[in-house]
C-alpha cells in the first residue's frame, strides 16, 4: 500500500488538512503530522532551542509543538512506520503564489520532504471565503495519483494553487511560473490594553507580475496552477557575470 505523509502550516485542526487527509486516504495509507497551532509564515524554520512535544489525537493525527518543517523532519526521521512514498502539504487556507512561496510554511513542509529524498507536493486554496476545500482535495488526489503513476524529476516539488470554486467550474490545469507581488503593505501601529506600543505586519501587496504564464494569471482565470519549484536557489545565469565582476575587483 502506498504511504503518504501529510502536513501543513495552518495547524492540525485546520479544515484543509482534514479534507486533504480524507481525500488521500482513498488511495493510500496516510499519516498526518502537523503543528499544534497556526504557523503561517514560518517558512523553513526549525526548532533548535526547545524540545519537540507531540500529542497523539483521537482521530489518529499527531500534533507537534513545532514548525511545519519540524513536523515533516520528525515524522520521517522518527514517527513514521517506514518511509513515506510521498509528502503532501496543505490544503493551505489562502494562496501560495509568487513571493508567497518564500514565506510559506506549507511550501516549506513540502521542501523538507524533498530535502529528505521524497517526492513532495504543496497545495493551497486561493480565495477569501474559502468554501471549496473539496475542490482542492479532489485535485490534490488526482495530481498525487499522477505522480505515483508517472514520476517526474526528483529535484523539484510541485506547488499547486486551486481557485476557490465549485469543482465543475474549474477550467483545467495549467503549468505556470511564479508571478510576483508588490512589497507588503505598511506596518500597523497600535497599543495593547496596557497602553504598550505594538505593531502588526501589513498584508501582502497586490500582484506586480500576474501576466499570462504566471500562477496568479492561471488561478484568476479559473485554472489550477502547478509550478515546479527547486531547492537550489543559485542564480545559475549570473555565475559568469559575477565571475567577470570578481575578476575586476
Swiss-Prot record:
Cited Gene3D superfamilies: Survival protein SurE-like phosphatase/nucleotidase (3.40.1210.10)
Top EC class for this record: hydrolase
Cofactors, names only: a divalent metal cation
Taxonomy, superkingdom: Bacteria
InterPro entries (UniProt xref): SurE (IPR030048), SurE-like_Pase/nucleotidase (IPR002828), SurE-like_sf (IPR036523)
Broad class of the protein's primary localization: cytoplasm
EC number(s) given by UniProt: 3.1.3.5
Recorded catalytic activity of this chain's protein: a ribonucleoside 5'-phosphate + H2O = a ribonucleoside + phosphate
Pfam families the UniProt entry points to: SurE
Molecular function via GO: 3'-nucleotidase activity; 5'-nucleotidase activity; exopolyphosphatase activity; metal ion binding; nucleotide binding
Record text on cofactor binding: Binds 1 divalent metal cation per subunit.
A GO cellular component annotation in the UniProt record: cytoplasm
Residues at which a divalent metal cation binds: 9-10, 40, 92
Role of this protein: Nucleotidase that shows phosphatase activity on nucleoside 5'-monophosphates.
HAMAP family for the chain: SurE (MF_00060)
Protein name in the entry: 5'-nucleotidase SurE
Organism: Shewanella sp. (strain ANA-3)
Gene behind this protein: surE
